[in-house]
Swiss-Prot record:
Keyword DNA-binding: yes
NCBIfam families for the chain: DNA_bind_WhiA (TIGR00647)
Annotated GO MF terms: DNA binding
Cell division is among the record's keywords: yes
Protein name in the entry: Probable cell division protein WhiA
Matching InterPro entries: Homing_endonucl, Sporu_reg_WhiA_N_dom, Sporulation_regulator_WhiA, Sporulation_regulator_WhiA_C, WhiA_LAGLIDADG_dom
Organism, scientific name: Paenarthrobacter aurescens (strain TC1)
Pfam family, one: LAGLIDADG_WhiA
General function of this protein: Involved in cell division and chromosome segregation.
GO biological process, one term: cell division
Keywords: Cell cycle, Cell division, DNA-binding
The organism's place on the tree of life at top rank: Bacteria
């Protein structure tokens, strides 16, 4: 099951007893998933959601908390839409429910944000607002660099109300307008985890955290692999450059090279891409890395001094830009 669907499925099965909390959730669901329509002179409330379990939860809450009946209409997917959608419709007593849930104010005017009783409610009410908004129009992407939890909002007022509810929970969320659509977005992984916990999606959080950890381990492994590859490449480049310098050193010094330095230099030339450790093991008798490095260093210093005395190019002259290319 996709992450968004698993979160919604879990939230739709969450058992809430407190009346004020259930009211806050219903108000948010109707605000973020619904709308008011005038049909034959009567106010009808419709809320469209993407899971049958969410529709059943809303229908049950409307009946148990407010005492109004509703119906669920299944809208089959077609065109760009995949999967069925579920519309919870309240025809009879639609106006009464709209007033009770804060979709209409005392004068019968539409409320654009959330009702003040919900906005100024408890922390549990703020959690319920987020739960209802997420069930209505929320999404959660896979953890990673572009992970996000977001809710599509019916307008800027409801987006700001949702940001305010997050703030009451100590959570930072941002309201944004993207291509004319208002959204509230959370991108920080730890903050997403906190909100999932506060909403009550504990099982989904475990799945999300496991995937998050797996992504982080994989990213770390890739970084280390790239680091190792880069180090190996640089080591090989340094070895090739050293081989070219030794070639020039032997040319400059000719027969005036002490045998032990000449032997080390010839090893370097013969095995241009070998590491100093490998050169030491190839020597007969074997030498330590420091011993072979010391001999090559003295050979190069001797050759560069001779080149300076003679006024000719030193050992660096043999190192070309191509040898140092990444």
């Amino acid at each position: 099951m996709a992450l968004t669907a698993s979160v919604k499925d879990e939230l739709s099965r969450l058992d809430i007893k407190k009346s004020s909390v259930r009211k806050a959730e219903v108000s948010a669901m109707l605000r973020f998933a619904g709308g008011l329509h005038i049909i034959s002179g009567r106010i009808v409330i419709e809320a469209e959601v993407d899971l049958a379990s969410t529709a059943r939860r809303l229908r049950a809450a409307i009946a148990e908390v407010y005492g109004h009946q509703s119906e669920i209409i299944v809208v089959s997917g077609g065109g760009l839409r995949r999967g069925s959608r579920y519309v919870v419709r309240v025809v009879r007593d639609g106006e009464a429910l709209a007033r009770q849930t804060g979709l209409l104010d005392g004068r019968g005017r539409p409320v654009r944000g959330l009702p003040s009783a919900v906005v100024n409610g408890s922390a549990a009410d703020a959690e319920a607002v987020w739960r209802g908004a997420f069930l209505a129009h929320g999404s959660l992407t896979e953890p990673g660099r572009s992970s996000s939890l977001e809710v599509t909002c019916p307008g800027p007022e409801s987006a700001l109300a949702l940001v305010g509810a997050a703030r009451r929970l100590g959570i930072q969320a941002k309201a944004r307008e993207v291509r004319g659509v208002d959204r509230v977005v959370i991108r920080d992984g730890d903050t997403i985890a906190t909100l999932l916990t506060r909403m009550g999606a504990h099982d989904a959080l475990m799945v999300w955290e496991e995937r998050r950890m797996r992504k982080e381990v994989r990213a770390t492994a890739n970084r280390l692999a790239n680091f190792d590859d880069a180090n190996l490449r640089r080591s090989a480049q340094a070895a090739v450059a050293a081989g070219a310098r030794v070639d020039r050193a032997l040319e400059i010094l000719g027969d005036d090279v002490p045998d032990h330095l000449k032997y080390a230099g010839e090893l370097r030339v013969a095995h241009k891409q070998a590491s100093l450790d490998e050169l030491g093991r190839l020597a007969d008798p074997p030498m330590t890395k420091d011993a072979i490095a010391g001999r090559i260093r003295r050979l190069l210093a001797m050759a560069d001094k001779r080149a300076l005395d003679l006024g000719i190019p030193g050992t660096e002259a043999n190192v070309t830009p191509e040898m140092m290319d990444e």
